Amino acid sequence: QIWVFGGGPGAEVFLKNYREQVPKQWLNETLIIAIDGATRLLMKFDIVPDVIFSDLDGIRPKDLQKKAVQDAFLVVHAHGDNMDKIKLFTPILKQWAHLIATTQTESALPVINHGGFTDGDRALFLIDNFVLNKQPVFLFGYDFGSVVGSHSKPEYAEDKKANSMKATKMRFGRQLTEKLCSSSIAEYDIIACGERIHAKCEVSEIFNFNDFKNLYLDKQWRSS
């Protein structure tokens, strides 16, 4: 299975409520993907991501200097207003063993534009090139609401209401996510914890760990 942790508050709700009940074997057998600041969130709950997608505004240099994450594949996105971040992280990126560079403009190898708009949907556009038929992909923190998770930015101490520009970006992200999830050969499933998520693709509401356990086992059985 593939588990993707995004920037919405639902990711933290899931981990706070159910992290201790998730069997270690599940984590060992799952590809864990962190979207930007979700890297810090996962590490807080002693989960090391296998892949990190970031435009570098949700993480700090010291987050990538932790030995535990340095075997991860790091997908770094460059766009018009993060050149200062690129320069700040350059000493770390030069030493990174598994680095993929992406851009919002035309591809110029080895830098690629694989599609997508926000960090969350951009990650899905890349991994969808490698998924298997009926492979389960769970999306946590893909809430698409009016709230931005506290782990989205290092300077956030709590969840914040999205401003108008962020809300617009989230709307585009939701539309792209819906389109990809609905057309993929894999089985994408947005996990809703607490707040209801409105999306034109598969959404599973989790009210307790048994709900998630049954969903996990059902997806595992159907994909085998």
Feature roles, as predicted:
Residues 7-9, 56, 142:
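Active-site metal-binding loops of divalent metal-dependent hydrolases
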Residues 87, 98, 129, 139-145, ...:
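Buried, small/hydrophobic-residue-enriched core segments of structured protein domains
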Residues 101, 136-141, 189-193:
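A structural signal for short, well-ordered beta-strand segments and their strand-loop junctions
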Residues 1-40, 44, 50:
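N-terminal glycine-/serine-/threonine-rich phosphate-binding loop
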Residues 4-6, 36, 77, 102, ...:
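Short beta-strand segments
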Residues 30-31, 37-134:
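Acidic/Gly/His-enriched mid-domain segments of enzyme catalytic cores or analogous surface patches
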Residues 48-50, 131-152:
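Glycine-rich phosphate/pyrophosphate-binding loops
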Residues 1-21, 148-150, 155-224:
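N-terminal donor/sugar-recognition subdomains of glycan-related enzymes
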